[in-house]
Amino acid sequence: MNTKLFKLVLTLLAFVLIFSSCDRKRSATTGWNYNDEKNGGFEYVFYEEQETGPGLVLIEGGTFSMGRVEQDVLYEWHAFPRRVTVSSFYMDETEVRNVDYREYLYWLRRVFVDYPEVYKMALPDTLVWRKKLAYNEPYVELYFRHPAYQEYPVVGVNWRQANDYCAWRTDRVNELIMVREGLLNMDPTGQTGENNFNTEAYLAGQYEGAVRDQLPDLDPNNDFRKVRMEDGILLPKYRLPTEAEWEFAALGLIGNMLAQERIFNERIYPWNGHYIRIDDRSGFKTTDVGQIRANTMRGRGDYMGMAGALNDHNDIPGPVTSYWPNDYGLYCMSGNVNEWVMDVYRPLTYEDAEDFRPFRGNVYQTQVRDEEGNIAEKDSLGRIRYRNVTDDEAFNRRNYNTADNINYLDGDYESSIDYDNEEANKDNTNSKRMYNTGKPMIGENGKPTMRGGDKMTSMIDNRQRVFKGGGWRDRAYWMSPGTRRFLDEEQSRDDLGFRCAMHRVGSARGGIE
């Protein structure tokens, strides 16, 4: 009886799905048919799910307590715990490798022959290995180029270079999708200078490429057309993860979900327990118990252990798939190398930011357009040009009224000691008002000095970007995803790399509506 009822329910569900799909062939608001060239050819795309880009892992989002989970031993007070929500997104399974970055450099040198400075600007700073009282010249010469290190994470890359890599990767992945779908041919010899595949330039009609085929156009005035964003063929942009996304993915609390919406064990690290060694046999081999889970510095002068019994097996960064992945399947979210995130650093961001998709660093831009309102000609590197939104364009908006919102609530004139000074409101993008208020003057010796009682300075400004995760030079304290540090966006370190992320469109869970 139950079996017959079950079959009947399945049959009814099948009919519902069939008829609902038929209904979607006609507009529910106008009654006009979709995808019918007889009435103009408006297209309805039967989209299933977002394709997972190369190297990415789906991170199902949700709510979590962002911030420190252990004692603030440095008394920085800049990571107060706060509950926030992160949308589902994609994250690289591993840190970007040396071989990945060399592939990027090879493409730049091959395509931008007339602009060698583009290649030079993208080169990682291999001199970060140098220490005044250490002999690290072999790493300066070999770490980035030698094939022995090609599976190791790239270091010496600053925040700006990491963002440029993400943009390049977006275009290469989408170009390959176009080739795979039979719409373009690979054209390595034809792509030089500005004539290279750029996703935005293609969508704006400013790149043709080696066309293999086109999509049929249901517009009765045309026979064929190029791919549009509405087709769902091209992927969203690769980018750096936000600080909240990175921390959420690193903790991997989905692995501690023992009941519906109940997580009984908070995590200090991307794994359970209070130690960086494996202290539980569940899910591990007996021989794994006692092994160190991450590439870190165990103590003063101890980067790898003793000969014959190396503790983390690496004296410098190790291969990106070293150690055990967390519950999202991500490798080295603690240790190996620190990782850049997208956020501008402020001590109180955790208190000020929104509780949905928190982020500090928004500078709103719009595409440059000509006098007729069309998208302006792309630049010499084949990219669509952007400019900051003007205050006039943002006037009367409720959600923002200026382009640069980096200083909002923490660095703008309202949050400074000059909040009642009308002159101070003229430049709201200068964080020195809040964090570097010392006013210099020329002293008696003719050298710049500070006025008495006015000597407050700070390293914090709009160029300071957050990095997280701890690296091979760090103690266990920095392995906790809730810890945070900052560095100028044009500086780099020998223990700092990055990985990419991507927004997920549609449903929060893959394959489930």
Residue ranges and their predicted role:
Residues 2-9:
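Bacterial N-terminal signal peptides that target proteins for export
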Residues 19-21:
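C-terminal motif of bacterial Sec signal peptides marking the signal peptidase cleavage site
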Residues 30-58:
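Post-signal peptide N-terminal segment of mature Sec-exported envelope proteins
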Residues 48-137, 150-173, 335, 504:
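A short glycine-rich, aromatic-capped structural motif
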Residues 44-46, 76-79, 454, 484-489:
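Short, P/G- and charge-enriched loop/turn segments at secondary-structure junctions
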Residues 480, 487, 495:
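Active-site beta-strand/loop architecture of penicillin-binding DD-peptidases
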Residues 26-36, 58-59, 65, 70, ...:
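Functional-site microenvironments in short loops/helix caps that host divalent-cation chemistry
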Residues 500-507:
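Short beta-strand-to-coil "C-cap" segments at the C-terminal boundary of structured domains/repeats
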